Amino acid sequence: MAPSVTIDNISDFSPITTTTKTTSFNLRTLLLAPPSIASHEEKLRNVLATHDRSVTDLQMLDRLSAGLVTLPESTYDLVLILTDADGTRAESTELLTRDVFGKITQALKTGAKLQAQDGTFGQEIDGAEYREAILAGLVTEGGVMLKPDHSASVAVPLRLRRKDNSKTTAVSNAGPPVSTVEVPVSGKRKSVDMTEDVPEKDVPKNDVPKGVGFIDFSDDFDAEDDDDELIDEDTLLTEEDMKKPLAIPPECAPRAGKRRRACKDCTCGLAEKLAKEDAEKRATADSQLQALKLDADDLAEVDFTVKGKVGSCGNCSLGDAFRCDGCPYIGMPAFKPGEEVRLLNNDVQL
């Protein structure tokens, strides 16, 4: 009897099919941590445990502020600013400068959010944090700061109402008046409706466009031209005001040592005081110089023709280097004994 043979048609290498859950999209998150949290590993580990590490990035705020880190553009759906190690946001708020806000805004996707871990970001409208976020291009929606969508264009119809022929109407040289114009926010003209034709002869011309006025700067608005009503500046201060002592600031008060210079727009009286002192010193010096001047009547003649007549020291003719302190010829050049010396207007003539 022949043995029976059974053939197994099932493949031994058939892979086991497993079902995987796929999400339509993954929200990419960026965590910005202050420097103080780097030394508290436990707190940082607890924060990372609440986020999916496959779609979560961690950056330090101080490195971002110093320009050591570059964020990719239009990448993150959520940027979360972590609190400091002590539970506040004092350190992170100091690092959030205008430059850092600009980098964060570029890294956000359209409609992405910028939040803080404690939920207090952008709550104070008068705060510097809120102002810098608005200047960076973020908007507030539902109490959350997010990046708006600037690509969407909205058509704004501009309806130009027609007026009767009796009223003036501005006419364009390019053609008949336009009834409806739709202009998108992006600045590009979408459509122009120019179906209505109006003859130019039926529209009266007006040299002055509507809404344009002219200002006559010479018009005094019917004010009375009375120059007597001008205030005399000499009457602003009374005699009692002039008697009051001047309030000199402490920095302008006289001090020992180097004399202080007056300010350019001095109002405390220091400039006048210094000018008066300088004038007195100049007058005193001029009076002293005036006493030393010799007039034409003050001519003196010294005759040394008499032989054998010498001074007390005998060195008068040798020069100042050999003359005594009381010599009347100090300042005169050396001369020969017996030579006639004349003093004419303080000039020595030999």
Swiss-Prot record:
A motif (Cx2C motif 2) lies at residues 324-327. One of its GO terms (cellular component) is cytoplasm. Residues 165-209 are annotated as: Disordered. Residues 252-268 are annotated as: Fe-S binding site A. It is found in: Cytoplasm; Mitochondrion intermembrane space. [2Fe-2S] cluster binds at residues 252, 263, 266, 268. Residues 23-156 are annotated as: N-terminal SAM-like domain. InterPro entries: Anamorsin, CIAPIN1, Dre2_N. Its main location: cytoplasm. Keywords: 2Fe-2S, 4Fe-4S, Cytoplasm, Iron, Iron-sulfur, Metal-binding, Mitochondrion. A motif (Cx2C motif 1) lies at residues 313-316. GO terms for biological process: iron-sulfur cluster assembly. Residues 190-208 have a biased composition (Basic and acidic residues). The keyword Nucleus does not apply. [4Fe-4S] cluster binds at residues 313, 316, 324, 327. One of its GO terms (molecular function) is electron transfer activity. Residues 157-242 are annotated as: Linker. It holds the Pfam family DRE2_N. Its cofactor is [2Fe-2S] cluster; [4Fe-4S] cluster. The C-terminal domain binds 2 Fe-S clusters but is otherwise mostly in an intrinsically disordered conformation. Component of the cytosolic iron-sulfur (Fe-S) protein assembly (CIA) machinery required for the maturation of extramitochondrial Fe-S proteins. Part of an electron transfer chain functioning in an early step of cytosolic Fe-S biogenesis, facilitating the de novo assembly of a [4Fe-4S] cluster on the scaffold complex CFD1-NBP35. Electrons are transferred to DRE2 from NADPH via the FAD- and FMN-containing protein TAH18. Belongs to the anamorsin family. HAMAP family: Anamorsin. Monomer. Interacts with TAH18. Interacts with MIA40. This is Fe-S cluster assembly protein dre2.
